[in-house]
Regions:
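HhH-family (HhH-GPD) DNA N-glycosylase catalytic core used in base-excision repair
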Residues: 2-313
Length: 313
């Protein structure tokens, strides 16, 4: 058994590689966090955890999913948490090496928004609602993100003008039919064609929207072949410029990129705000305007604290 210790500015990780006779192995990593981050709160923040290929064991409080990295065989990545300042990661698969573990670390950091600095949000919340400030300081206020920007975009497109069960079915079929058990890359989507998205994945009118977005983002080098966003990010206005992406989708994807200045208002959000605040849909953004760049956090975290559920949660 090989024990290797790595150190970096924000984290320490201990890797243990245990091969078996068939070349499979396990790598265990302990990732130390720069600030408290609650895995449970992040998982329960919105409905993403209910979409393939995520798996959440609510008894063991373990989050896992299959990943296909750089065209290799599929690996399973599992995370759990013993304290708010560390995450335990396990990688299971064949030929696990340092390059793979480095990539998995990047994925897990993205899932839990480890690199997001909550200081400004906490400062605003202290003026607006001290409960929200405390929630963020205690490790809440993060929203489960997919392994890539592209996956978050695709899943958001699958929520448009449909019900939650239909969204879950579409995403499940994308994983099974196109991704061979993992979430498909942009190249896999582009290669499968619009007809496959309609017939095999039941995406309906979303099929040309997804094909157009995929080819546009790839050709303009906004995303990599694996779906990672270019350095520098993407703005709300740039998201709106993608044909077929409207204000709701742009707001939701921007939120997952830590732009909390817009509230993705759909029928479910509209219903909640009408019941809670007597607001019409076009009044929601203005009602939370005093939160400035953190409008969405003002809305969503207040709602979480009121013990109301996000759609699909």
């Amino acid at each position: 058994m090989l024990h290797i210790c790595y150190k970096c500015r924000l984290s320490k990780r201990k890797l243990v590689y245990t091969p078996d006779t068939e070349g499979a192995g396990l790598v265990d990593i302990n990732l130390q966090l720069p600030v408290p981050i609650s895995l449970v709160d992040t998982v329960n923040s919105h409905g993403w955890v209910n979409l393939a290929p995520w798996n959440w064991d609510s008894d063991q409080l373990e989050l896992s999913r299959p990943e296909c990295i750089d065209g290799r065989t599929i690996f399973t990545v599992t995370v759990n948490q013993s304290t708010l300042t560390n995450i335990d990661i396990r990688i299971a698969g064949q030929a696990v090496d340092d390059l793979l573990t480095d990539r998995v670390l990047c994925l897990v950091k993205r899932w839990i928004s480890m690199d997001w600095n909550p200081s400004d949000a906490i400062n605003i919340a202290r003026k607006m609602d001290v409960r929200v400030a405390q929630l963020i300081a205690d490790g809440g206020g993060r929203f489960l993100r997919s392994s890539t920007f592209y996956e978050d975009l695709v899943k958001t497109i699958c929520t448009v003008n449909t019900n939650w069960n239909s969204t879950k079915r579409m995403v499940k079929l994308l994983v099974e039919e196109i991704g061979n058990g993992a979430f498909p890359t942009p190249l896999m989507i582009a290669d499968c064609g619009e007809a496959a998205l309609r017939q095999r994945c039941k995406l309906g009118f979303r099929s040309p929207v997804l094909m157009n977005a995929t080819t546009e983002l790839l050709s303009e080098h906004v995303i990599s072949d694996s779906g990672d966003l270019r350095p520098g990010g993407i703005s709300y206005q740039e998201l709106l410029s993608i044909r077929g992406v409207g204000p709701y989708s742009a707001s939701h994807v921007a939120m997952l990129e830590h732009d909390f200045s817009h509230i993705p208002v759909d029928s479910e959000v509209s219903k909640y705000c009408e019941e809670k605040y007597l607001l019409k849909p076009d009044q929601v953004a203005g009602f939370f305007e005093s939160w400035g760049d953190y409008r969405f956090l003002g809305y969503k975290l207040s709602r979480i604290l009121d013990q109301r559920n996000w759609i699909g949660g």
